[in-house]
């Protein structure tokens, strides 16, 4: 008859956190080896992007406290939050909106100078 294995921890139910794999030891015994949960990779937080972030460690949330800061972030604006394409598009969008504001200011100030020139030419 096959050898039976028992749980090593207190929880005796087949839950998601209590998954077990059968492993044969060098001594020939079958023992229960606990399997860690599958880790979800860190994704870009921009709406509709959901790209995996490169350079960020894929660990369980509790393990983030123990790993180095260099494994948790990327040395860039929004590093560890947004992917590089989303950061690039945000920078370009911000630049273009600033350009539009400058152009609007120039367009508003131009007619005033034209009126002054016309008045000085009439005199």
Curated annotation (Swiss-Prot):
<dbReference type="GO" id="GO:1990904">
    <property type="term" value="C:ribonucleoprotein complex"/>
</dbReference>
<dbReference type="GO" id="GO:0005840">
    <property type="term" value="C:ribosome"/>
</dbReference>
<dbReference type="InterPro" id="IPR038562">
    <property type="entry name" value="Ribosomal_eL34_C_sf"/>
</dbReference>
<dbReference type="GO" id="GO:0006412">
    <property type="term" value="P:translation"/>
</dbReference>
<dbReference type="GO" id="GO:0003735">
    <property type="term" value="F:structural constituent of ribosome"/>
</dbReference>
<dbReference type="Pfam" id="PF01199">
    <property type="entry name" value="Ribosomal_L34e"/>
</dbReference>
<keyword id="KW-0687">Ribonucleoprotein</keyword>
<comment type="similarity">
    <text>Belongs to the eukaryotic ribosomal protein eL34 family.</text>
</comment>
<protein>
    <recommendedName>
        <fullName>Large ribosomal subunit protein eL34</fullName>
    </recommendedName>
</protein>
<dbReference type="InterPro" id="IPR018065">
    <property type="entry name" value="Ribosomal_eL34_CS"/>
</dbReference>
<keyword id="KW-0689">Ribosomal protein</keyword>
<dbReference type="InterPro" id="IPR008195">
    <property type="entry name" value="Ribosomal_eL34"/>
</dbReference>
